[in-house]
């Protein structure tokens, strides 16, 4: 459960953010709305089942074990997570509507401030 994050973001909150975004029926827009409403992903995860009942949908968080495996795989690959509200998140990317809430990156992040080319992929490609 070691999700590297900015010091202002606890490991528990970093893990909860990854878990929230990886949960079924939670995309970047609903993720942002839940964080805004509850202030923390830990609180949003606790509220998911009740929100689903009231909305006539079933919302369940992805099992923590799946996220633990992902985090471990990212760590073993030498990569790290960067959240949309952390220092170092690319400023131009942040301006895009629907910008990814979480980036998984490897290498020297400070180079992103210079002109560059990025390769971007989706976990759930259509």
Which residues fall in each region the model found?
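Short, positively charged patches
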Residues: 1-126
């Amino acid at each position: 459960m070691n999700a590297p994050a900015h010091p202002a973001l606890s490991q528990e909150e970093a893990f909860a953010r990854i878990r929230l975004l990886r949960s079924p029926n939670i995309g970047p827009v609903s993720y942002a709305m839940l964080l805004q409403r509850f202030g923390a992903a830990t609180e949003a995860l606790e509220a998911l089942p009740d929100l689903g009942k009231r909305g006539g949908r079933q919302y369940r968080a992805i099992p923590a074990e799946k996220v633990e495996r992902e985090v471990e795989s990212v760590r073993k690959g030498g990569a790290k997570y960067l959240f949309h509200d952390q220092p170092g998140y690319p400023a131009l990317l942040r301006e895009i509507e629907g910008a990814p809430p979480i980036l998984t990156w490897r290498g020297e992040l400070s180079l992103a401030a210079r002109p560059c080319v990025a390769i971007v992929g989706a976990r759930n490609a259509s």
